[in-house]
Amino acid sequence: MKYPRLEPDAIRQALSKLEGWSLREDGAAIVRSFKFSSFAEAFGFMAESALAAEKLNHHPEWSNVYSRVKVCLTTHDSQGVTERDFLLAEAMQKAAAGRGN
């Protein structure tokens, strides 16, 4: 299913409601780096985020090195940022909040 790509103004407005997220230089994704106190906290965040991603059927591009997790969200079918990216970003914010990020 193809989801409508958000207009730049809608992306800026949605980003203003999320702490630490920004628009990638090419405008095709939103990105954030999370820093936790330990690898276990980072991995717990990833596990909780993975469950949210499965529920939304929308999966992140991400990498983990020790206590840091870098995330890139885009909707490949729409070739840009959609509401689904923001739904997953919000879920990730909640997952990080309880982990001292």
UniProtKB/Swiss-Prot annotation:
Annotated EC: 4.2.1.96
GO biological processes: tetrahydrobiopterin biosynthetic process
UniProt xrefs under Pfam families: Pterin_4a
Catalytic activity: (4aS,6R)-4a-hydroxy-L-erythro-5,6,7,8-tetrahydrobiopterin = (6R)-L-erythro-6,7-dihydrobiopterin + H2O
Example GO molecular function: 4-alpha-hydroxytetrahydrobiopterin dehydratase activity
Keywords, alphabetical: Lyase
Family note: Belongs to the pterin-4-alpha-carbinolamine dehydratase family.
Cross-referenced HAMAP family: Pterin_4_alpha
PANTHER family from the UniProt entry: PTERIN-4-ALPHA-CARBINOLAMINE DEHYDRATASE
Official protein name in the record: Putative pterin-4-alpha-carbinolamine dehydratase
